[in-house]
Amino acid sequence: MMMSNRVLVAMSGGVDSSVAALMLKEQGYEVIGAHMRIWYREEDEELYEQNVKGCCSLAAVHDAKRVADKIGIPFYVLNFKEPFYDWVVKNFIDEYLQGRTPNPCIACNRFIKWEEFLKRAMALECDYIATGHYSKIVYDNLKNRYLLYRGKDKTKDQSYMLSQLTQEQLARTLFPLGDYYKEDVRNIAEQNELGVADKPDSQEICFVPNNDYGEFLQSVVPEHINPGPILDAQGNKLGEHKGIAFYTIGQRRGLGISLGRPVYVIDIDADNNALIVGDKEELYSDGLIAEEINLIPYEQIENSIDIECKIRYNSRNVSSTLQPYGNDQLLVKFNQPVEAVTPGQGVTFYQDDLVIGGGTILKATTKK
């Protein structure tokens, strides 16, 4: 069946998705704009209506609608409250209660934007979805596969968040901004009088007011947030923590203990509700084991390959080797020890600008 040129653009009200919609319209696509209404706590609904900054606030809806009207495309607000809670919020809560540190944006991309949003697009008889992500998709005729690449603007590249996309999802996705710099995108918005050229990039967890995830967890699952011991690696008690959900690997501030030297969270023992602290050297690992693997250029990896990996959104890439580990897991071995490998975070594998794939960090391997 021939693909049509109708595309559903996820419009947050920000400059990137606004310009993406404009570009596609100018390229001859039949563009429909849509804003995703996500879940908030009842007490945060008023903040949703008042918040002028948030990517998912009512103000953002108004901005997206104004842009859609300006460029002359239909616009819908789609209700994703239930699936967002089921796939993103529940996972966020569960991961923290297990002593892990999740990245809800990766879960949102995987289960909401490229699962539920794609379903809505098909219901609207669209053959593509599009977003304002700074990444590129190329079809490789030799491999007969869609490939994902880092965007031209390496300071805004978002491929780390996209490494869970499948071949079926990549085939139905357009990234109009992949070959542009952020400054160019802002200039395009200004030249076309979209009214969003100067909007700042969103930094917060969209469903957590003020990015205070500790307060959020305390309010939604107070029965699971309990104080417990702070221990050293030998099991000696050094103090008491407020609840493991308030801490992450590598954290130094806010531990509430004074030992005459800096100490860091080096492990979280959720089974015993204990926080393990140690010196900075104890934060370093020689590798990690990743689960929930998705590979893009290959069906599977059979032998060790040289890669670079990214273990959190704002971290530098690390030269490594990648090899099978069994049970649908992969082993990453760093060429040099790496600090604060954090279970629950996403890990993305690269060769130059090509995204090999990604997964979720299960655990660090040998501490240095």
From Swiss-Prot:
Its EC number is 2.8.1.13. It is found in: Cytoplasm. The record marks H133, Q345 as: Interaction with tRNA. It catalyses: S-sulfanyl-L-cysteinyl-[protein] + uridine(34) in tRNA + AH2 + ATP = 2-thiouridine(34) in tRNA + L-cysteinyl-[protein] + A + AMP + diphosphate + H(+). Disulfide bonds join C108-C206. GO terms for biological process: tRNA wobble position uridine thiolation. One of its GO terms (cellular component) is cytoplasm. Catalyzes the 2-thiolation of uridine at the wobble position (U34) of tRNA, leading to the formation of s(2)U34. This is tRNA-specific 2-thiouridylase MnmA. The lineage of its organism: Bacteria, Bacillati, Bacillota, Clostridia, Natranaerobiales. The gene is mnmA.
